[in-house]
């Protein structure tokens, strides 16, 4: 099984949140979306300690603008089978015996654990654990604590950068233990690196070695893991790393144990190259991984379907991620390449301006500066769609909760893009709210006929032999003799000389609509 979903109501900094997890999940979002509260909900309940966690007053959410906390909070954990009919396995018999598995339409059974907290009239705090049936009602179970402990033992949560991993005697043993072979030496190097980068104990610096050599050993281990067809090496690494974790009578690392590892902003401590090595290493472990990050480098290594974007609103925290049905295989492949290699930073934006090519990217960027519009501060990103296609990008933006607006040329291709936008619009949404179609064949011709012909003539080094000026030929030569960025800067400089009133009205309206969408 793996953790499939978590519902949070009234816990710490989260008023409401419903989030779907996959075996490997990366969470991104602006500050204050509730990251610490979400990670705490996971690590406190599945804490691998001997006692079930009991809520305290600080766990109850205080709504915005109020001084009093809510009186009731709920955490609902949904676990899902990895394989159909997993309930037949020996290790699931206790859950089957109490009829805790619930059928689901997708054929994979679910297990629901609800943890509730309540403040009574005497200000006493009560915590209740229960398993739910298909109707959401608590299943009567006499040995509820024992069943909850068994679930925690299967899926203990370990939070890297967490004080519970701060165990200097483990670190000391790692350094002084006898190394028998190259493989054990490489595994030990990985363990030392984890201690060095993710433990915050004052004595950790005493155990560090040459980290360059350690990372080299970790990289060698990656190559061996990739060739490990029997998975024996993966298991050896897993059980070696298990020595870093808390041990008690309930936690026994076996073939059915699947810990949930929380990596909290690993990029904050690691160089991008080191992030890549560590990321590949942990991908071989039989764990469920949940990572928070603001790293473009890390995002570029993650499958699009594993990225979840979280946005906090006044009433709740919304989670957005790509569904398996949102894109076909070809669109997914093209979009993945485009995002990973060119536009990872765009995933951290709340608004996309989708344009056909490089020229539009440069010109719109320069126009925004002249209008004193800081696109980065506004969360706006200009994204070129020529490589991946317009429709997949709009689909992805909608799935991830990113607002979007399209700028296209006035040629046949532009009219086709207009039809794509029309199909993607929600009912009753005017086409003009999502797209601007230039009244000329492209943006260069638009500027040429709107008072900036002299810029193109100058850049083209055009020597007039008559009063005839072939517009298209001059534009082509201007681009050939300079570059698209240089053309954009030249137009920007000319507009700066004339004043912002010379910016064509169509672009002022475009930015006005974009800002309106970005602030909704």
Go through the PLM ranges and name each one:
Residues 124-130, 152-260:
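Extended helical coiled-coil dimerization/tether regions that scaffold
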Residues 87-178:
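A sensor for short, sequence-defined functional sites
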Residues 25, 79-83, 117-121:
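Beta-strand elements of well-folded, non-transmembrane domains
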Residues 1-47, 222-343, 362, 516:
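Switch/communication elements of ASCE P-loop NTPase nucleotide-binding domains
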Residues 418-490:
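Activity-critical C-terminal alpha-helical subdomain
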Residues 299, 305-414:
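RecA-like P-loop NTPase motor core
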Residues 364, 369, 461-520:
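Charge-patterned, long linear interaction tracts outside catalytic cores
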Residues 40-104:
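Conserved P-loop NTP-binding catalytic core
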């Amino acid at each position: 099984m793996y953790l499939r979903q978590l519902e949070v109501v009234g816990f710490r900094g989260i008023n409401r949140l419903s989030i779907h997890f996959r075996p490997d999940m990366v969470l991104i979002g602006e500050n204050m979306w509730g990251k610490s509260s979400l990670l705490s909900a996971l690590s406190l309940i599945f804490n691998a300690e001997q006692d079930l966690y009991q809520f305290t007053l600080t766990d109850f959410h205080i709504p915005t603008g109020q001084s009093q906390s809510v009186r009731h909070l709920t955490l609902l954990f949904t676990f899902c089978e990895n394989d159909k009919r997993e309930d037949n396995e020996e290790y699931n018999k206790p859950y089957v015996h109490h009829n805790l598995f619930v059928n689901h339409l997708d054929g994979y059974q679910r297990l629901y654990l609800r943890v509730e907290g309540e403040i009574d009239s005497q200000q006493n705090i009560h915590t209740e654990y229960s398993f739910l049936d298909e109707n959401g009602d608590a299943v009567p179970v006499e040995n509820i604590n024992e069943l909850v402990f068994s679930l925690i033992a299967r899926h203990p949560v370990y939070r890297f950068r967490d004080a519970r991993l701060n165990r200097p005697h483990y670190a000391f043993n790692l350094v002084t233990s006898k190394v028998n072979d190259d493989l054990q030496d490489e595994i030990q190097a990985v363990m030392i690196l984890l201690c060095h980068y993710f433990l915050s104990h004052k004595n950790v610096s005493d155990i560090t070695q040459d980290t360059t050599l350690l990372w080299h050993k970790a990289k060698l281990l990656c190559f061996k893991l990739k060739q490990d067809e029997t998975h024996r090496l993966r298991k050896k690494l897993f059980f070696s790393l298990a020595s870093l974790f808390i041990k008690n009578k309930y936690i026994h690392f076996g073939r059915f144990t699947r810990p949930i590892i929380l990596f909290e902003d690993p990029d904050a401590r690691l160089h991008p190259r080191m992030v890549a090595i560590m990321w590949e290493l942990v991908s071989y472990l039989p764990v469920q991984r949940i990572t928070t990050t603001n790293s473009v480098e890390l995002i570029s290594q993650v499958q699009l379907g594993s990225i979840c974007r979280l946005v906090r609103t006044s009433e709740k925290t919304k989670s957005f991620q790509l569904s398996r049905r949102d894109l076909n295989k070809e669109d997914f492949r093209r979009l993945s390449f485009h995002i990973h290699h060119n536009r990872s930073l765009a995933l951290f934006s709340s608004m996309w301006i989708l344009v056909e090519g490089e020229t539009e990217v440069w010109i719109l960027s320069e126009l925004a500066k002249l209008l004193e519009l800081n696109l980065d501060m506004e969360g706006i990103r200009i994204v070129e769609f020529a490589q991946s296609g317009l429709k997949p990008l709009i689909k992805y933006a909608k799935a991830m909760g990113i607002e979007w607006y399209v700028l296209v040329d006035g040629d046949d291709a532009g009219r086709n893009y207009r039809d794509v936008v029309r199909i993607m619009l929600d009912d009753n949404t005017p086409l003009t709210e999502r797209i601007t179609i230039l009244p000329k064949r492209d943006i260069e011709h638009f500027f040429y006929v709107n008072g900036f012909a002299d810029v193109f003539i100058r850049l083209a080094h055009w020597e007039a032999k008559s009063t005839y000026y072939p517009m298209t030929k001059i534009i082509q030569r201007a681009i050939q003799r300079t570059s698209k960025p240089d053309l954009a800067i030249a137009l920007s400089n000319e507009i700066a000389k004339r004043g912002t009133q010379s910016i064509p009205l169509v672009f002022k309206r475009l930015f006005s609509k974009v800002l309106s969408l970005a602030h909704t």
